[in-house]
A protein has these predicted regions:
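A short, structured loop/turn motif at beta-sheet edges
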Residues: 1, 24-28, 59-63
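Short linear motifs in intrinsically disordered
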Residues: 1, 40-49
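C-terminal structural segments of small proteins and small subunits
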Residues: 46-83
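Surface-exposed loop/edge segments in extracytoplasmic proteins
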Residues: 14-17, 63-65
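Short aromatic-glycine-(Arg/Gly/Cys) micro-motifs in beta-strand/loop hairpins
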Residues: 1-16
């Protein structure tokens, strides 16, 4: 099994994975990245109207996978103005 590192991005904040996780294959890497991204989204959304979350995976040397989630709330009906 190979060791992969899952770095997490929340807009401009970066949390680097310096421990890594051993994975059997690329399917396992994709599954862990997706679960990590879903967990991050559950923790931080909806705290902003727009947010970019990502999990970038590398093997210590080379990039392997990028997973992105972009959340944007688009207000279609503005709040009424008060005088």
């Amino acid at each position: 099994m190979a060791r992969y590192f899952f770095d997490t991005y929340d807009d401009d904040q970066i949390i680097e994975d310096d421990i890594g996780t051993e994975c059997e294959d690329l399917d396992a890497v994709k599954a862990i990245a997706a679960l990590s991204l879903a967990e991050l989204a559950r923790e931080v959304l909806p705290s902003n109207i727009k947010r970019h979350l990502a999990v970038n995976v590398h093997d210590g040397t080379n990039p392997v996978l990028e997973s992105h989630l972009i959340f944007e709330a688009i207000i279609r009906k503005p709040e009424p103005l008060t005088a």
